[in-house]
Amino acid sequence: MGALEYVPALGPKPRRSTRINVDALVKLASEVLTHHRHLGGRFAGTSGGKALADILKVGTSAGGARAKAVIAWNRRTDEVKSGQLPAGPGFTYWLLKFDGVAGNKDKELEDPQGYGAIEYAYALMAKAAGITMTECRLLEEHGRRHFMTRRFDRLDAGSKLHVQSLGALGHFDYNQAGAYAYEQAFLTIRQLGLPMTATVEQFRRMLFNAVARNQDDHVKNIAFLMNKPGEWSLAPAFDVTYSYNPSGNWTATHQMTINGKRDAFLKADIRAAGKSAGLKQGRSEALLEEVDAAVERWPEFAARARLPADVTEKIRKAHHLDLSG
């Protein structure tokens, strides 16, 4: 991801982007995640080796624990190619998160089929809350619905932008849950010389995570872009989805703190964070009202994503719309 490249010392260098079969990649990703300890014996055949080579082409630099791929997609023809190399006219560059993959999870519960549709509904809701995101959509095939988000580190012609996470810039370890604060994100924004609009944008994302139960909000899920002249900017929001497991060790509470707290936030905590961010008096409450208004429309966005009624209701009940104090 980003503009950094690593070239193998040995082996042939690919010269062009090749077409890929999403269905085959999903099946192989399931095999990889389910039988990762026995890969040597399971993919020795010619077709298996070809499929494994394909998934390595598109997936190894996407990052994260869940199965995903970097692809080039042609909107007119619906053709999908590897996104590692320039794909030619008509193609744009996307990150595809596989749906229906056995063993697909991050730190806790395995993702159910349809998880991508939840992320799509959340993307719609986040945009309604005024959060900046790239274009998102669902790629449907064989009863699966893969979440796609357009890459913000690639320009239309495929040229690259440098990207660094908050964790990378601050040398923060995202595995240390609760060790870092949203206030540190606001400080980093100031240190990079970004305008107040970037601080307001990040504050809005913090509120959305708190209200909509995106509790996998660690320091690698905030990123910054640098263009060729060396100018920094806050990257669009990403990994914005329902992530709450009240009985888990990871997402039972938030990964980053607000006013020193990881859960049970009060309006007083929001005001304190707003003061730390340099917001004018009353601005934090106004932003919270805007986010609340969008999250209250959750059933509308869930319907647009065609989520089952029981899933919609479970998530609605978990939303934290009752901040007091």
Which functions belong to the PLM regions below?
Residues 1-325:
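Phosphate/dinucleotide-binding and metal-coordinating scaffold of catalytic cores
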